[in-house]
């Protein structure tokens, strides 16, 4: 949890608004560890129930991803910590730049470091 907490604190130090969003997984113990780490750090968070499975799956659409260098500038990033431990950033959904909507940028994993560029590229899916 050090990376997203540090990212949120760093963003705030530059005057940016931050919000940590959390979706529960089927790994209950790990979920509780994440929540405990956020509480211990004094970081507020929002619990979201929108997932890519179950009742919410029909709400998600397939979007074409873009490489970072293809994207227009965005000054309103949302950082997402997935239940897998992967951390992504993307522009807010209501931004006027269509290419940037729901185009995740893989920041890393809180569980393990990728050993090579090929593994990182597979996770980024760019």
From Swiss-Prot:
Pathway assignment reads: Antibiotic biosynthesis; fortimicin biosynthesis
Enzyme class, UniProt record, top EC level: isomerase
What keywords would UniProt list here? Antibiotic biosynthesis, Isomerase
Q: Name one GO molecular function term.
A: isomerase activity
- This entry's Enzyme Commission designation comes to 5.-.-.-
* Example GO biological process: antibiotic biosynthetic process
Tell me the function of this protein. Answer: Catalyzes the conversion of fortimicin KH to fortimicin KR.
| Protein name as it appears in the record | Fortimicin KH epimerase
Origin organism is Micromonospora olivasterospora
The gene coding this protein? fms11
């Amino acid at each position: 949890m050090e990376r997203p907490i540090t990212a949120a604190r760093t963003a705030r130090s530059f005057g940016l608004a931050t919000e940590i969003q959390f979706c529960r997984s089927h790994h209950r113990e790990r979920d509780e560890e994440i929540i405990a780490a956020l509480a211990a750090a004094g970081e507020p968070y929002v619990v979201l129930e929108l997932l890519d499975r179950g009742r919410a799956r029909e709400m998600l659409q397939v979007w074409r991803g873009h490489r970072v260098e293809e994207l227009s500038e965005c000054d309103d990033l949302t950082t997402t910590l997935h239940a897998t431990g992967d951390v992504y950033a993307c522009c807010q959904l209501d931004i006027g730049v269509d290419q940037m909507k729901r185009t995740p940028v893989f920041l890393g994993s809180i569980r393990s470091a990728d050993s090579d560029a090929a593994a990182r590229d597979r996770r980024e899916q760019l």
